[in-house]
Amino acid sequence: MIDVTSLSAYDLSQKLHSGEISSLDLCKAYLDRIKKFEKDVQAWQFLDKKLLLEKAEEADTYRKSGKPLGPLHGMPVAIKDIIGTYDMPTECGTVFRKKMSNSQDSEIVNLLKNSGAIIMGKTVTVSYTHLTLPTKA
């Protein structure tokens, strides 16, 4: 059995579209990998496993409907915690935004979702990454 977590996005997209792998199985494989390494890596700021698996099942059901699919249909994608989402906290790596979310998704999240991607969650970012500060010349 091939380790799907080692495949490129292109290869995963091909396997998802052909039905060789399901979105649910792919998401479960990623969750297993996260469980294995998260204690040491501490990469995730927000990850709702139950919601991820629900969205994966929805993607698989939609795929079976025969309706047109986006190029990233059923593909799990992680985003940094500075990218705004309405259904997940966007804390920007600071306690001042603890559990705050946006009123709408950012443009990149809209593009990903419209392409069929599943937003897995938010990865950790450095505090105030979103700010631009002057530099010395």
Feature names for model-found ranges:
Residues 130-137:
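Single conserved hydrophobic/aromatic residue that forms the stacking wall/gate
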Residues 123-128:
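Short, solvent-exposed turn/loop segments enriched in Gly/Ser/Thr/Pro and often Arg
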Residues 39, 71-111:
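Enzymes and membrane/adaptor proteins characterized by extended Gly/Ser/Thr/Asp/Glu-rich
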Residues 33, 37, 55, 59, ...:
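Short alpha-helical functional segments enriched in proximate histidine and acidic residues
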Residues 1-54:
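An N-terminal boundary/leader segment
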Residues 79, 119-122:
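General beta-strand structural signal in soluble alpha/beta enzymes
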Residues 49-72, 79, 98, 102, ...:
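Flexible, acidic active-site loops/lids enriched in D/E/S/T/G that coordinate Mg2+ and/or position polar
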